[in-house]
């Protein structure tokens, strides 16, 4: 074959042939090998190899047997015991790393690709307690040593008389035997001491791995506590009892500030020391180029590219505050992800370094090659630093978790025992009201679903007895919740009245009753069971935003509200903007609890197609109720209960105030009106919301008697009375949360009307329908 022809020839089954086949190239000439010659050559070589291997195996076994009996090769046996200890330490370390699950899935897959023996080596002796040889196996003498001892003792026992001539023979023998015994004892002691040292280092490896995992879990718990505190205090303070309401006014970054700082300091310190240990392994204990590829390591990335103050050895608190956006939750989460990746990378490189394949092929007593020296040289101060960081973070976490958020000092508890007791009773009543309303809402949804099924059944002309019994049973289930809700409402109002008026005598407390026009008191109703804050309530973990970010600011433009000063209105505006921002963060942090399809389904279950909330028009007076009769002229009874509901969003929750139907302002005194209108520093009365060029509010709402003004001033000055805000939130979150959702139009409900209606009635009806659609 010429040289020019050789360039175009590709041998079959060669690497070039396989490569070209993978690329899809077939326009080349294939030169197949002679298969018969290959087969003959392989068979001949195989037979020769088999005979040679058999001969070598027989000879090697004989030599090994003789060596085992030879007393001059005991040094090699000693080195083999040290080698067994070395392999045992490596296997024990690998088992600890794999069992503690400190490696992320990507690093496990990379180890399986680079060195599959590590995964199998860590699982070879899972049923055994230890990979290291026992002290008994180390101190056990071999056959030659046992034979020498047996022969010597037999000769001593058989010797009958001692003389000077015999002492010349047995004296040197005794000296040699004593020297042999001392050397054997020293060697056994050295091996046992090495085994104890390796056991200590195995315990250190196990402690370091477990501390790393515990620190990761503790940081995860701390971040969850920070997240829950921020979420609950801003968006769910009035719906859940997990966070005190007094912290709702703080900025998001001010919640658990000490815990945020502790998380940043400890995670940053552990990240830096783990990164230095990984770089030290790469520099002083290099492996092959495939394992030490720079693309497989985070530690080779410059720290200045990572940010968050990691490039500096010591960073001040002010610089850390600026670099992490006031120790914000997103920055802490990024730092936590960096720590997880760096920690897993350190243990991955350590596992590859301690692999049995990287051990010395033959027994070696060089201290630098022993694995426990490698371990101590690599980690240095890492275990102590990691333990100190975990202790600091655990102390801060326990303080904010168990002391700051739940307990009070003994002095405060003694000084404010009465006030705290009253607040706890009030909170228990409101909490019970929330749970009863939630259960009531669920039962009402089920009842409405059953009614829809019965109404949609065209074959059923009349209600069957079975359906009647079913409906009666459903109503019987609903009745206790309604009665309990009324009782909780009345008890909460009475608690507020007691806290405001502070009666001197306790005799009138039991006889005192609160009047409520909206919710009449049910007679002969047993008191409802109150649920304490300490009781486990599964619903507290359901974090779902009951607010709509699309609410405009037109609802809050009223300047005629007499309860708030301009500074307070500005503060409420800032809180509404903060609530919208927190809501956007909640969608990214917590995820959506329900899809849009499920929300539409809930809306259809909660409200029928006629249950449309009709807001007041600006040009209509407050006391005018004629549009109620024109919403559904055919069925006037459906208009009841859908008037005067103007929700407003404050602090991330919806507050709804219901006005009674056809209220006679002429027959209503000021005190009754003050009881109807809730007063709180967190709620703006919606009935006074009108434009500036319209008629002002009625006199009873703008001009108040001195007694009412004094009472409102006391309520306004008290920072502990936020009952109306919380109660309105419970009702809004459980009953009228979907009034801000986009309205679904299933058809024009005015198409089926008769064409013989008069022109005035048609005009009024069209105006009302446009109001509904608007």
UniProtKB/Swiss-Prot annotation:
One BP term from GO: cell-cell adhesion
Coiled coil: 430-457
GO (cellular component) term, any one: adherens junction
Keywords from the UniProt entry: Cell junction, Cell membrane, Coiled coil, Membrane, Nucleus, Transmembrane, Transmembrane helix
Compositional bias (Basic and acidic residues): 758-767
Transmembrane segments: 138-158, 163-183
Keyword flag GTP-binding: no
Membrane topology: Multi-pass membrane protein
MF GO annotations: myosin binding
UniProt feature, compositional bias: Acidic residues: 746-757
Family statement drawn from the similarity comment of this UniProt entry: Belongs to the vezatin family.
Summary of the function given for this chain in its UniProt record: Plays a pivotal role in the establishment of adherens junctions and their maintenance in adult life.
Protein name according to UniProt: Vezatin
Lineage of source species: Eukaryota, Metazoa, Chordata, Craniata, Vertebrata
